[in-house]
């Protein structure tokens, strides 16, 4: 039932863009495996072998730590409505630092230079494999809307509050692996 591809085909891109949520999975050789849900509105397919997403401030920063240590990253979309399908993007990921030249360029090119409140970095994936599978066991869900709590929280924090939060909560993974913020907020 599963099929493998060397790159993202046009119909894969269309499938990704129709979804409401995607999941990212990362790990190091040691420690826990991380799996996180993300809003597809933050994800951009920029070529047959490249995607990235705008990553918002959260209670942890596992993906960034894992990418620094190992680089492996998998993104997955599932059809929760319409015809069943699961699509996985495999490859090597990297962190694009907040407010770096590359970050600013990608923000301008793919988000109209409009930054979501709480944005902390971008996660880039060089795709070296695509897999689709049937998804016939994935349940159907009715979409009822986006949550706005994180954006409202970030707006309330302001830049200084977000920086303080990241310095406390986003410097290392739960297994103690450093993130890009470890150097930025070094004591």
Regions from the language model: what does each represent?
Residues 1-187:
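Binding-site signature for planar aromatic cofactors or substrates
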């Amino acid at each position: 039932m599963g099929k493998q591809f060397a790159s993202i085909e046009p119909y894969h891109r269309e499938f990704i863009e129709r979804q409401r949520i995607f999941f990212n999975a990362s790990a190091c050789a040691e420690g826990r495996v991380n799996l996180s849900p993300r809003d597809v509105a933050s994800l951009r397919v920029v070529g047959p072998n490249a995607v990235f997403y705008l990553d918002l401030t959260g209670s942890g920063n596992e993906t960034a730590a894992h990418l620094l240590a190992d680089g492996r990253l998998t993104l997955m979309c599932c059809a929760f409505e319409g015809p069943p399908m699961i699509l996985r993007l495999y490859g090597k990921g990297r962190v694009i630092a907040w407010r770096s030249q590359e970050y600013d360029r990608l923000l301008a090119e793919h988000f109209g230079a409009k930054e979501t409140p709480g944005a902390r970095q971008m996660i880039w994936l060089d795709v070296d494999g695509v897999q689709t599978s049937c998804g016939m066991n994935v349940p159907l869900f009715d979409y009822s809307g986006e949550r706005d709590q994180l954006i409202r929280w970030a707006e309330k924090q302001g830049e200084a509050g977000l920086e303080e939060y990241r310095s406390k909560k986003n410097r290392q993974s739960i297994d103690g692996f450093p993130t890009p913020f470890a150097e930025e907020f070094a004591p």
